Regions:
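Double-stranded beta-helix
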Residues: 147-213
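Short, structured patches in soluble enzyme cores that scaffold and shape functional sites
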Residues: 107-109, 124-126, 142-146, 158
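A short beta-loop-beta micro-motif enriched in histidine and acidic residues
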Residues: 125-137, 193-194, 200, 223-224
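Non-heme Fe(II)-dependent double-stranded beta-helix
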Residues: 2-17, 24-122, 128-131, 243, ...
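Short, surface-exposed loop/helix-turn segments at secondary-structure junctions
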Residues: 54, 124-125, 179-193, 224, ...
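Non-heme Fe(II)/2-oxoglutarate
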Residues: 45, 50-57, 166-171, 205-207, ...
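Short, conserved beta-strand element in jelly-roll/cupin
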Residues: 131-149, 199-200, 207, 231-234
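Feature marks short, surface-exposed loop/turn motifs that line or immediately flank catalytic pockets
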Residues: 114, 148, 163, 234-236
Length: 273
């Protein structure tokens, strides 16, 4: 199988307590090099399906080499990436962790942080989907390279899924201080911060709650840090009647006339009971 994982009671306990879990083995390692090749082609503007992704934040020759590169909804452009992010195992696992009846993909990310690639601001994923009812999310984060503290791996604020939902970050890409918005929240609300870096091998996985604060620092290593991410919402989630904050300005265009459904042509249903 391409993807395989088994969630036990300890995983569920850890997720509910901390807002995230990490597992060392998730995706069959034979796929990693091919996925890296596909990612390189995407950023060169070569799309297997002929369809551009919804967001394409870095282009060769146009943008600085030392920023973190991002593509959103690469599943529309590449069939191998679609096979990963639309895998039923992801939907079932996130549903178990969140207590949902099922899950659908709201958006994927391909993130490529090159050597000296800059940081990504601490944020909560759910803050970007006020255009979805209910405003909740859960995320599957799959590294294609070994994740170490020095290569700018993902960091979680432990137990922060129990805090308030804050507005989206104003300075997500390459901020001067990637912890500023989190630090501001901590000071105002008198919270104590404990962070946990995701240190797992290539082909492992982390799952996190949409309320969990997370971000990543500069890649201080001399190797690339590439990740594929699947963001999911409950299977029965709908469009909010009017909200368009966060990523809504991009994704409300997929709202059908006279309907509030998240249509599976644009927001694939991954799994349901």
């Amino acid at each position: 199988m391409m993807i395989e994982v088994s969630i036990n009671k300890e995983h569920l306990k850890d997720f509910n307590r901390d807002g995230f879990i990490t597992i060392n083995k998730f995706i069959d390692l034979q796929y990693l090099e091919n996925l890296k090749e596909r990612i390189a082609l995407l950023f060169q503007g070569e799309f297997e399906t002929g369809i551009e992704p919804d967001e394409w934040n870095w282009r060769s020759g146009r943008d600085p080499n030392n920023v973190t590169r991002q593509i959103c909804n690469a599943w529309k452009s590449d069939n191998l990436i679609k096979k990963v992010v639309c895998n039923p195992v992801i939907g079932e696992t996130l549903s178990k962790l969140m207590g949902w009846q099922g899950a659908r993909l709201i958006q994927d990310n391909v993130l490529w942080k090159p050597p000296q690639g800059k940081s990504l601001s601490y944020h909560q994923d759910a803050s970007y989907v006020d255009w979805v009812v209910p405003q909740t999310m859960a995320t599957c984060w799959i590294p294609l390279d070994n994740m170490l503290k020095e290569n700018g791996t993902l960091e979680f604020a432990v137990k922060s899924h129990q805090w308030d939902l804050c507005p989206p970050s104003d300075n997500f890409h390459a901020p001067k201080d990637y912890k500023k918005e989190l630090d501001d929240y901590l000071k105002i609300n008198n919270k104590i911060l404990k962070t946990s870096p995701v240190v797992i091998p290539a082909g492992g996985v982390s799952f996190h709650h949409g309320m969990t604060w997370h971000g990543s620092g500069v890649n201080q290593s001399n190797t690339d840090r590439r990740v594929i991410v699947a963001h999911c919402v409950p299977n029965d989630a709908k469009f909010h009647p009017s909200n368009s904050g966060g990523t809504g300005k991009i994704y409300r265009k997929y709202k059908l006339n006279n309907s509030d459904e998240l249509n599976s042509s644009f927001f694939p249903l991954l799994w349901e009971k």
